[in-house]
Amino acid sequence: MKYFEFGQEHPELMVMLHGGGVCYRGALPVAEEMAKTYHVVLVAYDGFNPDEPETQFRSVPDEARRLGDYIVERYGGKIDILYGVSYGTFVLMDVLADKRLTITTTIANGMPTMDYADIKSPVLQNLYIFFLTGFSYWLIGKAGPIRKKLVCKMMGRTEESFDRIVYKDATWQSWVNQDKYMIGRHRNFDLFKRTDMYIWHGIASSTEKKLAKHVRAWQDKGYAFTYKVFPNMGHGTLAGEHPQDFSKEVQAAHQCSLQKEKR
């Protein structure tokens, strides 16, 4: 696990968590854009880092715990903006659960609103992983030209951005561990109260529409978050393909958080 830092001259700290099955390099352009305003820590997960090909992804709690250690040791546990996209929002939730940390603004972009299946039987878990992970690994992790076009259409992304983010050398076990340790885990909505929580979805893709399907139910239950839809964006494309627009949205959200703190 590595941490890449940009804009150290700025006082406010922004932590960025990329999605699953991809590497940190896809987030470099937006990290560099955000570094014009914030001190940015871009996280590179084990198992999906081309700079550390010998590593293996273990679990979401493991990634979150070590990130928490890093922030506590170097920055006293203070995060001004915590950002995660797609699978990275699972890591984000475990970071929110770390009581050592104080987080002002949290932005979950492309957050899946459904939990993994709650399966107790090890045999059924293995079957679930075989089909769920196997399909993702085949479709994304080992995508050829035809599958790449399909994924880009589903996600509303360009092929150039797909080539930049996907890490094709990740091991099968790293892909398995991404999903295995999420089985039976349920989102703790009380954690939303520990921060000023924002959930964003860009619904110009079939993938994102499915991920957002339970947002209305969350709103009806009164969970503490601010919701925003980007109708012309696909899955992760606001940050991945429009870094300047992304920066404006992040700054606006964070300013709202700071205003709320003053009330």
Label for each model-derived stretch:
Residues 83-92:
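Gly/Ala-rich beta-loop-alpha elbow adjacent to hydrolase catalytic centers
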Residues 4-52:
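Conserved HGGG/HGGXW glycine-rich cap/lid loop of the alpha/beta-hydrolase fold
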Residues 118, 138-192:
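Conserved alpha/beta-hydrolase catalytic His-Asp/Glu region
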Residues 97, 103-135:
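Flexible "cap/lid" loop of the alpha/beta hydrolase fold
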Residues 223-263:
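Catalytic active-site module of serine/aspartate enzymes centered on a nucleophile-bearing elbow/loop
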Residues 29, 94-98:
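Active-site signature of alpha/beta-hydrolase-fold catalytic machinery across serine-
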Residues 177-216:
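Conserved serine/cysteine hydrolase catalytic core
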Residues 42-83:
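Active-site loop/oxyanion-hole signature of alpha/beta-hydrolase fold enzymes
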